[in-house]
Amino acid sequence: MPADLHPDLDALAPLLGTWAGQGSGEYPTIEPFEYLEEVVFSHVGKPFLVYAQKTRAVADGAPLHAETGYLRVPKPGQVELVLAHPSGITEIEVGTYSASGGVIEMEMVTTAIGMTPTAKEVTALSRSFRMVGDELSYRLRMGAVGLPLQHHLGARLRRKS
């Protein structure tokens, strides 16, 4: 555990580092797809983790998506995720986490979504994260363009550093 890590983050310290792997996506309005992903969790000594994510196409490495933000721990067992997307969307998700026996699980749901005038409509998001040892997996559900909340993305990542 880093010496300067804020004590409120001790339970989530195993997330720190760089994770990489592959995922897949689907939604009724698009063709299913696969992607390569890198996620970095870092810290600055305050009671939040810095989160940065980017994806590329499996076929040709073309950039697909990115998001950046903060994973806050307002109280033990509670998390708040604050993210910005270059597609013109911001999101605030709140939820819970548990950390026991080398397993971290988080469940979050949006409480607020902001959109620029040119962003595609997104009305709901929720995320589930599970870290076991050196594997991090997640599922993202989305409600968008008039459709209800449903599965959109899932990935399995391995710790790189």
From Swiss-Prot:
Cofactor note (record) = Binds 1 heme b group per subunit, that coordinates a highly solvent-exposed Fe(III) atom.
- Top EC class for this record: isomerase
* CDD domains named in the record: lipocalin_heme-bd-THAP4-like
This protein's pathway reads: Nitrogen metabolism
Residues involved in heme b binding: H152
Q: Which residues form a coiled coil?
A: none
Which cofactors does this gene product need?
A: heme b
Q: What the record says about its domains?
A: Forms a 10-stranded antiparallel beta-barrel structure able to accommodate a hydrophobic ligand in its interior. In fact, this fold hosts the heme group, which is located in a wide surface cleft.
Q: What does it do?
A: Heme-binding protein able to scavenge peroxynitrite and to protect free L-tyrosine against peroxynitrite-mediated nitration, by acting as a peroxynitrite isomerase that converts peroxynitrite to nitrate. Therefore, this protein likely plays a role in peroxynitrite sensing and in the detoxification of reactive nitrogen and oxygen species (RNS and ROS, respectively). Is able to bind nitric oxide (NO) in vitro, but may act as a sensor of peroxynitrite levels in vivo.
User: How is the quaternary structure described?
Assistant: Homodimer.
Please give the name of this protein: Peroxynitrite isomerase 2
